[in-house]
Regions:
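Catalytic-core "active-site belt" of small-molecule-metabolizing enzymes
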Residues: 1-102
């Protein structure tokens, strides 16, 4: 296949204790899931439920790398995310069986 421009490299993250990397295709996020931070940002966790959104896979910044942001930024809020790698799909997975899919 021929592309008009070169496609981006596959986004990936390091795997602790391995030389392999894990490919990242999608990043699903949960907002307002940390109560203290939600309050700090002016939300009421008892009234405002968590919400879901996505980020592009190339939004990943590796450990120790520089976070790119506009030079005129005066109030930068960064977040550290927990990554769960789903190994196999499923539907209506029981709580007891959930970790068998990670």
């Amino acid at each position: 296949m021929s592309y008009a421009i070169s496609p981006a490299e596959q986004s990936s993250v390091a795997i602790e204790g391995s030389e392999d990397r894990f490919p990242v295709r999608r990043i699903y996020c949960v907002g307002r899931n940390y109560r203290a931070h939600a309050i700090e940002m002016g939300a009421d966790p008892d009234r405002d439920p968590p919400f879901f959104f996505m980020k592009p896979a190339d939004a990943i910044v590796e450990n120790g790398a520089t976070i790119p942001y506009p030079s005129q930024t005066s109030n930068l809020h960064h977040e550290i995310e927990l990554v769960v790698a789903i190994d196999k799909g499923g539907k209506d997975i029981s709580l007891e069986d959930a970790l068998n899919h990670v």
